From Swiss-Prot:
Keywords: Heme, Iron, Metal-binding, Oxygen transport, Transport. CDD domains: Hb-alpha-like. Pfam families: Globin (PF00042). This is Hemoglobin subunit alpha-A. It comes from the Eukaryota. GO terms for cellular component: blood microparticle; haptoglobin-hemoglobin complex; hemoglobin complex.
């Protein structure tokens, strides 16, 4: 998925609004995904999946950090997330569809917290960005 210059600007703009809330939004995204797509819980059998659990917050922080890293290296998302791609493909073996679920839930969280910022154009750009991140994370699957 190729991001245009306008897409990159839109994505960076949204993430500038997210600012210090990235970790909170990461955890909220995971909670939403676990409820909306309960099959995703199978990758976290050892987690306390209750609202506000320390484990969800910690993993949400990792998700947020990866997304921020991708935004900061939007011209080389594959390079920025290479180690994470290896982890998901070779060790964790996460079903690729789960990245689509995560992306959708992240869009919902952004829409809840920043409804005015999520214009149709920004929505499309953020969706393309999340698809690009998902594509990178599944690129090394065999």
């Amino acid at each position: 998925m190729v991001l245009s210059a306008a897409d990159k600007t839109n994505v960076k703009g949204v993430f500038s609004k997210i600012g210090g809330h990235a970790e909170e939004y990461g955890a909220e995204t995971l909670e939403r995904m676990f409820i909306a797509y309960p099959q995703t819980k199978t990758y976290f059998p050892h987690f306390d999946l209750s609202h506000g659990s320390a484990q969800i917050k910690a993993h949400g922080k990792k998700v947020a950090a990866a997304l921020v890293e991708a935004v900061n290296h939007v011209d080389d998302i594959a390079g920025a997330l290479s180690k994470l791609s290896d982890l998901h493909a070779q060790k964790l073996r996460v079903d690729p569809v789960n990245f689509k679920f995560l992306g959708h839930c992240f869009l919902v969280v952004v829409a809840i917290h920043h409804p005015a910022a999520l214009t149709p154009e920004v929505h499309a750009s953020l969706d393309k960005f999340m698809c690009a991140v998902g594509a990178v994370l599944t690129a090394k699957y065999r």
